Amino acid sequence: MASQGTKRSYEQMETGGERQNATEIRASVGRMVGGIGRFYIQMCTELKLSDYEGRLIQNSMTIERMVLSAFDERRNKYLEEHPSAGKDPKKTGGPIYRRRDGKWIRELILYDKEEIRRTWRQANNGEDATAGLTHLMIWHSNLNDATYQRTRALVRTGMDPRMCSLMQGSTLPRRSGAAGAAVKGVGTMVMELVRMIKRGINDRNFWRGENGRRTRIAYERMCNILKGKFQTAAQRAMMDQVRESRNPGNAEIEDLIFLARSALILRGSVAHKSCLPACVYGLAVASGYDFEREGYSLVGIDPFRLLQNSQVFSLIRPNENPAHKSQLVWMACHSAAFEDLRVSSFIRGTRVVPRGQLSTRGVQIASNENMETMDSSTLELRSRYWAIRTRSGGNTNQQRASAGQISVQPTFSVQRNLPFERATIMAAFTGNTEGRTSDMRTEIIRMMESARPEDVSFQGRGVFELSDEKATNPIVPSFDMSNEGSYFFGDNAEEYDN
């Protein structure tokens, strides 16, 4: 990307920092995850969780959600102004699972938000540590990406279910900041913009007045974020058109959906970070590991190494397969929901299967599920190799206009071929090339038509042994050319519903 020099690395976005050198970045990311770990240990102490209970991923998620809720200013304000029956705006809580007489029991806990905020700040040297909160949001978002399908959401905004690989980060809250924007897929940004334009069409006052001015600023900011994800001049020029539109309407929606489709071949650059559950950082801190001193990176070997030595458990429903549950969480930990299964399988060292073949539901347990029959098992989160996470879409020639990988948004910087059926995709582009954006559309279609399926992405990049922390000896895997492995084929996952 040409503008690389002006961009902050994701670790800087993650930690809200200005430009820093590599060591400072590693230290500030280390400080962030260390703070999460200290907070988690403190919460486990207050809740009197045993070591085993503290390693239960469901307990980790309840604690993470409580702190996110405690710091959700906008929602807290809303709850105070619109009191609803039986909801205390000053409290937050959730299910904590404990082991009693060989059985798991669910206990609903309630906490003062103020108290949780105090505990969190204390663990983070008295600061609000927004970066740590965003980090937890991204972990939840990555888990949702691996667990649920967004077909309904896609169809509602006029997109096609086949665009599911563009939907990374679609469940991230609005308040997730620059680090959140970096991990959102092209489809997610398009969906947010389309929803906004639709509101403007239906509500005359949406763009008017003082509020409308703020709305307009938000609209243009979102357009710029999306523009920054595209890597070709024509796609960016179309985004300028959408952003500058006097009063955005159906023409802009058409343009955005066209751009989303084009991103199936001309991939956008979307960041990937390995964000782990709070309990993993807690375990490391408890064992005496000093994250800030050692430094930490979300895109290198560190998360792999951390998972190599962490034992995390999960509740398992009666007919779920523990190995499948492990795969789900492994994918979430490495932000690999949209990665090619061939690449994931190679790195993990065990076969990663498409979601349609998984015998497992989500990680979280609904409040009406029967605890009598719940069991627990160890999640297998270790890997055979490690690889560097990427923020490029895997386009081939000089990372510019060329074939990215259909139905895959690469997570790991690892060489792979791009088996794809161009015909299937180009079929989506018959139709409208007139209007203000006609020349750009023509140019984009031309680039897509010249994309060659036999190209190789991430040429020469490989995976590394876990002992090779300086990434000196890349092992370039060779994959079966014929089939690209998308996680979403034959999909029967549940929908994500708030």
Curated annotation (Swiss-Prot):
Region annotation (Disordered) maps to 1-21
- Among the Pfam families in the record, one is Flu_NP
Q: Which GO terms describe its molecular function?
A: RNA binding; structural molecule activity
Give residue numbers for sequence motif Bipartite nuclear localization signal. 198-216
Q: What keywords sit in the KW lines?
A: Capsid protein, Helical capsid protein, Host nucleus, Host-virus interaction, Ribonucleoprotein, RNA-binding, Viral nucleoprotein, Viral penetration into host nucleus, Virion, Virus entry into host cell
| Intervals of motif Unconventional nuclear localization signal | 1-18
Localization, UniProt = Virion; Host nucleus
Posttranslational modification: Late in virus-infected cells, may be cleaved from a 56-kDa protein to a 53-kDa protein by a cellular caspase. This cleavage might be a marker for the onset of apoptosis in infected cells or have a specific function in virus host interaction.
Where does this protein have coiled-coil stretches?
Answer: none
Transcription: present as a keyword of the record? no
Superkingdom? Viruses
Its BP terms in the Gene Ontology are: symbiont entry into host cell; viral penetration into host nucleus
Example GO CC term: the record gives: host cell
Cite the record's note on assembly. Homomultimerizes to form the nucleocapsid. May bind host exportin-1/XPO1. Binds to viral genomic RNA. Protein-RNA contacts are mediated by a combination of electrostatic interactions between positively charged residues and the phosphate backbone and planar interactions between aromatic side chains and bases.
Role according to the record = Encapsidates the negative strand viral RNA, protecting it from nucleases. The encapsidated genomic RNA is termed the ribonucleoprotein (RNP) and serves as template for transcription and replication. The RNP needs to be localized in the host nucleus to start an infectious cycle, but is too large to diffuse through the nuclear pore complex. NP comprises at least 2 nuclear localization signals that are responsible for the active RNP import into the nucleus through cellular importin alpha/beta pathway.
The record's comment on protein family reads: Belongs to the influenza viruses nucleoprotein family.
What is the protein's given name? Nucleoprotein
| Gene name tied to this protein | NP
